[in-house]
């Protein structure tokens, strides 16, 4: 069995359209996952989910999907009111959010569609939408097993590991927002990084926050994001096969991202390792 991935949004914090971002994309986070059984999983609902929705509607009705949100910051939920399938009867969606959030994910999504900020209320949606809370636990889906891990990000966030139900050695980890460079203020505990490495260990693919350069991080410590060098070191420590840099800084141009990828590959080479490194781009497809 194969898990098939497609990136619909790769940018962090705020959409960044324009001529400098056409290759890697300007939409905020959204990743589509398909299993051989036909199940649809959506990771995060940034502005990238709008184009995913248009694609799904073009394929017909009767759409069913599980949407796993890493957390409730704007760039990970702002596409939901523009997700066309959610307005159509006969479609069904389960939206999963962290149990550790200060406010339920149900309340957060409803509030972003309140009349003062959006013209169509949540209760006017015609699809069936169910909200569920996920703790740090493992559960089985249609053709996959998903587990979660509490990462370091203001307000709380989760990373997810998806494993092929029929082939446990095939798995990928999705960690969109995570600060690897500091632990103070998060209450993670002394063994947090070791536990994170164990969570990621042996994955076929790691999609990880790579928002900052080392120089940029010095000015943004505590903001909840990692450098691309830190992402490489996590991937190496965990023995993953492939690293995909994600959550690109809005100001980062396509050429800048190319330079980050080149620097990561040089770092891997200096350490004598074979980790494959690339950067997430809208429209990019991968198989696990």
Residue ranges and their predicted role:
Residues 176:
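Conserved beta-strand-loop-short alpha-helix elements that form
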Residues 179-275:
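Cap/insert and terminal regions of metallo-dependent hydrolase folds
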Residues 1-173, 181-186, 197, 257-288:
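Binuclear metal-dependent hydrolase catalytic cores
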């Amino acid at each position: 069995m194969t898990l098939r991935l497609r990136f619909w949004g790769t940018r962090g914090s705020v959409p960044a359209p324009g001529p400098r971002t056409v290759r890697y994309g300007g939409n905020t986070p959204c990743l589509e996952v398909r299993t051989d059984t036909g199940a649809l999983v959506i990771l995060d609902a940034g502005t990238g989910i709008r184009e995913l929705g248009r694609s799904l509607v073009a394929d017909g009705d009767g759409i069913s999907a599980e949407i796993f949100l890493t957390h409730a910051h704007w760039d990970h939920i702002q596409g939901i009111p523009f997700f066309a399938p959610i307005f159509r009867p006969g479609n069904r969606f389960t939206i999963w959010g962290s149990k550790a959030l200060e406010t339920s994910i149900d309340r957060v999504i409803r509030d972003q569609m309140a009349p003062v900020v959006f013209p169509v209320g949540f209760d006017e949606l015609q699809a069936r939408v169910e909200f569920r809370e996920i703790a740090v636990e493992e559960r089985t889906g249609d053709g996959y097993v998903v587990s979660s891990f509490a990462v370091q990000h203001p307000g709380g966030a989760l990373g997810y590991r998806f494993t092929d139900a029929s082939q446990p050695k095939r798995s990928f980890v999705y960690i969109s927002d995570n600060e690897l460079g500091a632990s103070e203020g998060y209450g993670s505990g002394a063994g947090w990084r070791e536990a994170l490495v164990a969570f990621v260990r042996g994955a076929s693919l790691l999609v990880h926050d790579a928002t900052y350069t080392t120089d940029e991080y010095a000015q943004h410590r505590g903001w909840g994001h990692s450098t691309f060098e830190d992402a490489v070191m996590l991937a190496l420590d965990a023995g993953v096969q492939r690293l995909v840099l994600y959550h690109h800084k809005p100001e980062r141009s396509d050429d800048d991202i190319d330079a980050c990828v080149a620097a990561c590959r040089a770092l891997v080479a200096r350490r004598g390792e074979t980790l494959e490194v690339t950067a997430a781009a809208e429209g990019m497809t991968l198989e696990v």
